[in-house]
């Protein structure tokens, strides 16, 4: 199975927290149906990722092989575009990444609740393989993203309306999640030793 992939970045510090000095690699899925249909998230600035034809079809095994060759850490963030527009491929990619012991973070404009309403069986397979989901539409009026900031949380999350959902203890038999709202109340975010999510301090 292939993924329509726009690009990837290796060993960067702007793709979320990790246990390895906040280094992660990032995979950019090409295409966002919401944007292509004329209804992008308000203020979305990833224009080059909207169009599916901007990507190249790459096999899932080739993607993992490239990460294994080039990554110094086993932490990966999957963004778009919209990764869940390629849901079957996303699930298979995450299953393979998990076999290689990667910590997986996925960012989607779809909410967790909408995902379950849309295709409960498939999304539960996805949740069973990933560690963290950042969900919800980007809203420029609630922007917290700052690519000049040394703060890890603000270097990869777009706006305060988005939720951080800890799926580290989720399984098909034990559907445990912990959801964090209003994340701007926290100073920063980190990954616990067990792979779950933690937050530092409060801005209030």
Identify what each model region corresponds to.
Residues 3-5, 10-58:
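Canonical Radical SAM [4Fe-4S] cluster-binding loop centered on the CxxxCxxC motif
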Residues 20-22, 71, 99:
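Short gly/pro-enriched beta-turn/loop segments at secondary-structure junctions
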Residues 42-58, 72-86, 100-118, 127-165:
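Core AdoMet radical
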Residues 60-68:
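Short, charged beta->alpha transition segments
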Residues 62, 88, 92-99, 125:
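Alpha-helical scaffolding segments of alpha/beta enzyme cores, especially the outer helices
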Residues 63, 116-123:
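Short, acidic/polar
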Residues 85-95, 143-201:
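P-loop/Walker A phosphate-binding loop and immediately adjacent motor/lid segment at beta-alpha junctions
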């Amino acid at each position: 199975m292939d993924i329509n992939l726009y690009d990837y970045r290796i060993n960067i510090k702007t793709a979320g927290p990790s246990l390895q000095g906040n280094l992660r690699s990032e995979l950019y899925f090409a295409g966002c149906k919401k944007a292509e249909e004329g209804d992008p998230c308000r203020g979305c600035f990833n224009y080059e990722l909207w169009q599916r034809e901007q990507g190249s079809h790459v096999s899932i095994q080739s993607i993992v092989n490239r990460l294994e060759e080039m990554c110094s850490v086993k932490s990966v963030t999957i963004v778009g575009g919209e990764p869940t527009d390629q849901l079957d491929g996303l699930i298979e990619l995450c299953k393979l990444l998990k076999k290689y012991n990667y910590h997986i973070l996925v960012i989607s404009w779809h909410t967790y609740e909408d995902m379950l309403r849309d295709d409960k069986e498939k999304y539960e397979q996805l949740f069973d393989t990933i560690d963290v989901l950042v969900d919800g539409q980007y809203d420029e009026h609630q922007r917290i993203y700052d690519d000049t900031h040394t703060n890890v949380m603000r270097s990869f999350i777009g706006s305060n309306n988005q939720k951080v959902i800890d799926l580290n203890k989720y399984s098909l038999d034990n559907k445990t999640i912990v959801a964090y709202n209003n994340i701007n109340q926290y100073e920063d975010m980190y990954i616990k030793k067990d792979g779950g999510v933690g937050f530092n301090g409060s801005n209030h």
